[in-house]
Amino acid sequence: MNPNKRLLSLDVLRGITVAGMILVNNTGKCGYNFAAFAHAKWDGFSPADLVFPMFMFLMGISTYISLCKYNFQCRPAIAKIIKRSLLLIFIGLVMEWFITAIDSGNYFDLSQLRLMGVMQRLGICYGITALLAVTIPHKRFMPLAIILLIVYFIFQLFGNGFEKSADNIVGIVDSAILGSNHMYLQGRQFVDPEGILSTIPAVSQVMIGFVCGKIIIDIKDNDRWMLNLFLIGTTLLFAGYLLSYACPLNKRLWSPSFVLLTCGIAALSLALLLYIIDVKQNKKWFSFFEAFGANPLVIYVFSCIAGGLLVHWHIHTAVFSNLLNPLFGNYFGSFMYGVFFLLFNGLLGYVLLKRKIYIKL
């Protein structure tokens, strides 16, 4: 496929993941979530666990496409890579500061600022993957991604890395480097879901996406790249499932089995959408998600800030308690709050899309 042509299927699948993240993160009342929209508490897997890793996989594909225009030359691309990586990390830190500040009312107290988070993980993993893309042969990407997963698995295997306890190596490293006060929920869950060690397999996630991006762009024959993507997706899916017997599926730890399984699902989903949307040109049913996927990071950042303000101003509680809960009950009312908030964010995405405004972070 032409790397200069915008892949609508990529926008749509990104949009599905961003919409999923907004729904999962913005329910009417904590604890009243349908199972599909609640993360697994520790080991296990739910649809809610898929949205963030799928977004990271798609970021790997976008990284390949964006670096094509530099012909993967280090000198012209490196400034852009470093700038984008640092910008994502900075935005993540500002978001964490803002959410902490409006909760505490103290805008100058950084003692409990969470240092890692979704945007920080995106920035770090993008930066590492993109720098590797302009410095090493791409044929080494998949072997290197597997090696990183093996290294992380060894850490977990010999460091009590599968248990939800204080002596889990993943949590020990997070606490030692970040400090408990700067971890998710001040370290009360022992590990940070976007912590230090678990960034290793997260890099693998983006690298596998990069490899799939290479397949989509470099192979010109539609049947061939679809077959390759299907085979890779199926292999990763079954590998993740089989590995889960020795290495449990765990989003909070970003376990190797979790990486393989979610990459497999993402590859198969993208192959299907590429065929339906970009090959067969069946686009009309997907415009809703395109509005979220054309400017995914802008919509995500906006949703986090808007969601935090609605909670701080007590609008969130008022809408749920006085309107949605009496009409729909606890669970469905909580879900409907997320749906209305999703549509609210979709308005921004729709306006940007209609005006052909694409904000790249």
Predicted regions: what is each one?
Residues 1-361:
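Alpha-helical transmembrane segments and their immediate juxtamembrane cytosolic regions
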